[in-house]
Regions:
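Non-catalytic alpha-helical scaffolds and adjoining flexible linkers that form interface surfaces
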Residues: 1-24, 29-131
Length: 131
């Protein structure tokens, strides 16, 4: 396994898709590496301790193995949970979709990461009438 490196980063999950029986493919937005695609093996199993934290709008600290274009998630820790409801939830998903559409893979944008975090904090605070 030469050429592999382990990285640790703050990250937000923009989207997750089922992969095989027990895994997920994650699209994550990281502070220093931008948009990444990760494989989270075994997280859909009933005994998985990480399944409950792999949700959109949660600030996570992730560790991953960088082997190829598809990286392997090694560990995840929940740092901050943004709870979005009703219209705020739809706005959050729309922002996630925009990020996925316009960001290039592995193109760092730390300033946009901070702005995204601010948007989520604001959406979590406001009532639907204010959005």
């Amino acid at each position: 396994m030469t050429g592999s490196s382990i990285y640790a980063q703050p990250a937000y999950i923009l989207q997750h898709k089922p992969y095989r029986e027990s895994s997920l493919i994650l699209e994550v937005f990281t502070q220093d590496f931008g948009l990444l695609t990760l494989l989270a093996k075994g997280v859909r199993k009933a005994k998985s301790r990480t399944a409950g934290v792999l949700l959109p709008f949660s600030l996570l600290h992730i560790s991953y193995l960088d082997r190829h274009e598809l990286k392997l998630l090694l560990d995840v820790e929940l740092l901050e949970q943004h709870v979005l409801a009703r219209l705020s939830l739809y706005c959050g998903f729309y922002v996630n979709e925009l990020l996925q559409r316009f960001l290039q893979l592995q193109d760092p944008n730390p300033e946009l990461f901070v702005r995204y975090q601010q948007v989520l904090q604001q959406l979590a605070r406001v009532q639907d009438a204010e959005v």
